[in-house]
């Protein structure tokens, strides 16, 4: 009798553990599908455009381009205090990921605004190292291309994710990757981390994923030392 009870307990534990693993696996697949959909997007990318007006938490930009016979504007939502750095009439560069496509003549983004600089068409190159379960390889220079002296973490993050999606299929539902991080290192030994799997986000939507860019974190290309990407399969 005791043997039968013990067997039942063991089988129940095994079944429960197996169910938990299956549930976690489905959650990871849902997360990957959502991230693949979110980042499979054409960014708002404009150079030398003008700020129409600013509010306490938004920057409204006139792109001088037309869509649906109307002038196309970009409305960037930012954290409090960010708009103190900009005024009406400033020339800026925009690189942001739209999370809302209504109305059709306004692209809504979070952050993604830097003062315009005449960098020309020269692509900046950064040293990158990919670490997969402890195995390191240097990344090719085309892993991320940026043509501005100043750029936002949003632009760098997006371009790294696109590279990893195209070359390593990190967000494919059946891919072996379970977690990953991007570390951007500056020459003063500071590191800025981005969770490439957004595991702290409760809602699997573009709005939720892109809201992290509200801080409009800006880097000067001359300050960058290198970047590291860590991908894990277990």
UniProtKB/Swiss-Prot annotation:
Which positions make up the signal peptide?
1-24
Short name of one Pfam family for this protein? Stap_Strp_tox_C
Q: Which InterPro entries match?
A: Enterotoxin, Staph/Strept_toxin_CS, Staph_tox_OB, SuperAg_toxin_C, Superantigen_bac, Toxin_b-grasp_Staph/Strep
**One GO term describing the cellular component:** extracellular region
Molecular function GO terms recorded:
toxin activity
Enumerate the transmembrane spans: none
Keywords (alphabetical) are:
Signal, Toxin, Virulence
Misc. comment: Binds to major histocompatibility complex class II beta chain.
**Which family, according to UniProt?**
Belongs to the staphylococcal/streptococcal toxin family.
Task performed by this protein:
Mitogenic for human peripheral blood lymphocytes.
Q: What is this protein called?
A: Exotoxin type G
């Amino acid at each position: 009798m005791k043997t039968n009870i013990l067997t039942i307990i063991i089988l129940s534990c095994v079944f429960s553990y197996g169910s938990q693993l299956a549930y976690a696996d489905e959650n990871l697949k849902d997360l990957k599908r959502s991230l693949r959909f979110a980042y499979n997007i054409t960014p708002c990318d404009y150079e030398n455009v003008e700020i129409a007006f600013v509010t306490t938490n938004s920057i409204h930009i006139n792109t001088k381009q037309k869509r649906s016979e109307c002038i196309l504007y970009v409305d960037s939502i930012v954290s409090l205090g960010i708009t103190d750095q900009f005024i009406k009439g400033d020339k800026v560069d925009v690189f942001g990921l739209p999370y809302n496509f209504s109305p059709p003549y306004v692209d809504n983004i979070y952050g993604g605004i830097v003062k315009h600089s005449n960098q020309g068409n020269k692509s900046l190159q950064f040293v990158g190292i990919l670490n997969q379960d402890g195995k390191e390889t240097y990344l090719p220079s085309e892993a991320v291309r940026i043509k501005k002296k100043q750029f936002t973490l949003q632009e760098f993050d997006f371009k790294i994710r696109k590279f990893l999606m195209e070359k390593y299929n990190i967000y494919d539902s059946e891919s072996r990757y379970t977690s990953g991080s991007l570390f951007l290192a500056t020459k003063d030994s500071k590191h800025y981390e981005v969770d490439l799997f957004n595991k702290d986000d409760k809602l699997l939507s573009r709005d939720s994923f892109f809201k992290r860019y509200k801080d409009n974190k800006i880097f000067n290309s001359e300050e960058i030392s290198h970047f590291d990407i860590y991908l894990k399969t277990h």
